Every structure is written in C-alpha cells, then in structure tokens.
Amino acid sequence: MMFFIRPQKLIYSPVESFDREVEEQKDNDSRVVVRSTGPTIGLNPAWAVGIVMLLCLSIGSTWAVYFEQRLLFSFKSVNGFVSQWKCVNPATRQEWRTLSGQEKAEYLAAVQCLATKPSRVRNNGTLYDDFPWVHRYTSTSTHKASAFLPWHRYYIQIYENALKDDCSYTGTLPYWDWSLDWEDFSRAPIWGHDNFGSDGNLDAETSVGDGHCVIDGPFAGLTAMFYDNDYYPHCLSRGFKSGAEMKDLGNLVRPGVVEDIMREGNFEAFAQRIEHNAHRFVSGSIRGEFSKFTGPYDPVFFLHHTNLDRLWWIWQMMDPKNRLQEYNGKSNKDTLRRASLDDTLDMGGLRRNLAVADVMETTSDLFCYQY
C-alpha cells in the first residue's frame, strides 16, 4: 500500500535577483579646452580644482563599485550559499528506492568520504564523527521538545552541505519512507550489500544496543568512536527485531496511522505524535546505534530523518498560509516555557546557530528544496 498525500501547493512569487548592475558613468563635459598664448598653457585655477575633484570622485566611485562587487560575488554564508543567490528552482529530494544505481552509488561514496575528512568541532576524529557527537551533545533540548522538527531540518541540511562541499556530492538527501515497509522492514530496499548493509552478524558476540557488527555493504568495518556519552570505539552495529515485537513496532508507522497523524490540526500535536511513533519504530526495530543519541553513526539515520522532514513539509503545505509560521509547544521537555520562533537552534559548532524562524520554509534561500 503506497502512502500518498496530495497537499495544496504553495505558489511562490519570483524573487528579484540580488545581482547588481554596474553602470559606467562618463562625463561628456570632462574635456577642458584651453587657449595657447605662447609656449605655455594657461589654466583657470578654479577649473583645475574642479578637474581634480572630478578625478578623485571618479576613481573613488570606481573602487567602491569594484569592492562591492567583489564582496557580493565572493562572500559565502555560514551554510555555503553565495549571498546573492536566490532560491528559484528548488531541488527535489527523492525516496531511496526511486534512485538509479548510479545515484545510489554516488550518495554512498559521499557518505563514506566524510570519514576521511577532519573534525570541525573536536581536536581528533572525523567529520563523520561530528554528526553523532553533536546530536548527542544537543539531545536534551532537541528531543521531546518543540525544536525536534526544526532542529533536525537544519541538522540534515548541514549534513547535505558537508556531502557537497567536502565530498563533491551533486545530488540531494534521499529519504526512506518506512510506511511502505511497515509489514516487514527487514526487507526494505535500503538494506543489502549494494545499499547500507544488512543486519548485524548474529554469529558474532553482541556489540552495542543489543546489536552486532555489520559485515556487508559499504559501511562494514566502520569504526564508531562514541556510544552515547562515552568514548567507546566499536563497529557499526544493528540488531533487527523480528516476530510479534516487530509487528507491533511496524503498526506505529503503517500508512493508516501516518495518515491519521497528518490530520492533526496544530503543530504541537503533530510534532509529538510523529516523533513518538517514528522514534519508537526505528530505535526499537533497528537497535544498535539507534539505541542511543549517537544514532547518526548509522547512515540510515539521515534517510529516516529526511522522511520525517518530508512529512512535516507535507503537513505545512496542507495549509501553507498558516503552517509555514506555526510553531508552538514546550520549548524543552524539562521546562514549562513555551516555544517561540525566536528560540535558538544550537548546532554544537557544526555551523552557526539560527533561530527557529530561519528554518520554517524549505524553499528559502537557506535550503531551497522540496519533496
């Protein structure tokens, strides 16, 4: 059973280009005609002063325009986007099973590449390690809280930027629509040697999170440096559930349940239900890395959260006039303070912190994507 929701499409007005045209200014009266009275040329002092002033203004204006253009065309924002660039043609993120073999291979290679790049936030480790580390570092304010959806929207965008900027990836983040695989998630097309690998090796001893080492696929042999709060080098681990327990977990994301969640009328109710059901399903069914907040060590994490972002986007598009700015609920699970669009999203040093208001629209200049 396929899960389709046909939201109302929001029509965006074209955004005026930020490029500025530079016009050369020429003074047609700039030539000075003087009369010769012999071997020397006489020039009115007032005219001379005027000529000097015009030259100074012209040179100053030329250099000002030059430096302005240099700034406009060389400055990059903290998210890797050129400042004068506007979102005119948003990229479309696609479901994993719809990608070609070449597109899948390019994505997997870019993810592997992150493990070869130096850390941005610590003195050791890799860029790959940074994402689970930051996810754990910020977890108390980004889970069971209103910030869950907006924080992860920005977080996965930073991940996509890293794939592009550091590893030359040219595609977009794919997503995994687990509602298509609710009856037997272990047979989902994201698993297998040519995808993200399979279940952990049941013949080996238990690793972390009731999982075992993944021994097939491009991430076999990957070393995860942290497990929750602890420095604990270990293999990429998974421990698939099966039987009646798996059936119960699958029911959390079956199409009918997801469709019911999409009918929630306010952000707080929608966000709470989507976080509760999706997190219970993924962490309970895959286990291993997903058992703790260092779950981003499993590369499937990003396909999972891109799907959550997709569902939020669909929910927003059902009533864009109101929902593109609708954000409410508890700001943190340990406080009664209400959430605000002015709340800060702490990215743990991966990129500059932003306000929630900055990440509400996926077709903004910051993101420029759709589903």
Which residue stretches match the model-derived regions?
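Short, low-complexity, Lys/Arg-enriched N-terminal segments of secretory-pathway carbohydrate enzymes
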Residues: 1-43
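C-terminal accessory segments of proteins
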Residues: 44-46, 50, 60, 66-371
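Membrane-interface recognition of transmembrane alpha-helix starts
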Residues: 37-55
